[in-house]
Regions:
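N-terminal accessory nucleic-acid engagement/regulatory domains that precede
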Residues: 1-35
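Conserved SF1/SF2 helicase motif Ia
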Residues: 79-84, 89-130, 134, 152-155
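Short, flexible loop segments at the rims of nucleotide/cofactor-binding pockets, characterized by
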Residues: 53-57, 82-84, 132-137, 159
Length: 182
């Protein structure tokens, strides 16, 4: 299990996550060993996904730029063709934030089959920090997914838009450091 900031701390001291992010998820000096190991998109691409490089489009490193922008906390819009690597542009930064600040990235998708495919594809790569919570889950699978979000094991949460109305989802999101909505 990962150590996450307790919900009561987030509620009573909301700036604590800002301080943690500044210390653990903001690049500092060139040559910093921590930043080179934890905040470098190329190293993380290799260590987390096993890829040597990002895809390019007509010689432009669009996938890398999108991933780097997300790591830096910037808002972005990435438009790639089907199968062009859009998912990596949010999955890589999400996993990096999960490791550095125990952050949670919430991915909102209306397609339950797509959410399941995303989680299954990550699991096939040995990445177990992604879960989905939707109305099609049996109670045991749902409870296990909620537990992974609550205890900080999950860095990526895939939910459908209607799940945002759920009191359970609201409660678990308020108790976590949500770093990005996709």
């Amino acid at each position: 299990h990962r150590s996450i900031t307790p919900g009561w701390v987030l509620h009573n001291y909301p700036s604590v996550e800002f301080v943690i992010k500044k210390l653990r998820h903001t690049p500092c000096l060139a040559g910093c060993a921590y930043c080179n190991a934890q905040l470098d998109v190329h190293r993380s691409l290799t260590s987390l996904f096993g890829y040597d490089s990002f895809r390019t489009y007509e010689g432009e490193p669009l996938q890398e730029r999108a991933a780097q922008a997300a790591v830096e906390g910037r808002s972005l819009l990435a438009i790639f063709p089907t199968g062009g690597g859009k998912s990596l542009t949010f999955q890589l930064p999400a996993l990096m934030a999960g490791l550095s600040v125990h952050g949670l990235t919430v991915v909102i998708s209306p397609l339950q089959s797509l959410m399941k495919d995303q989680v299954d594809n990550l699991a096939e790569r040995g990445i177990t920090e992604a879960v989905t919570i939707n109305g099609m889950l049996d109670p045991i699978t749902r409870a296990l997914a909620i537990e992974k979000v609550q205890d900080g094991t999950a860095a990526l949460l895939y939910i459908s838009p209607e799940m945002l109305r759920s009191a359970t989802i609201e409660r678990i999101l308020l108790a976590r450091n949500v770093v990005r909505f996709v």
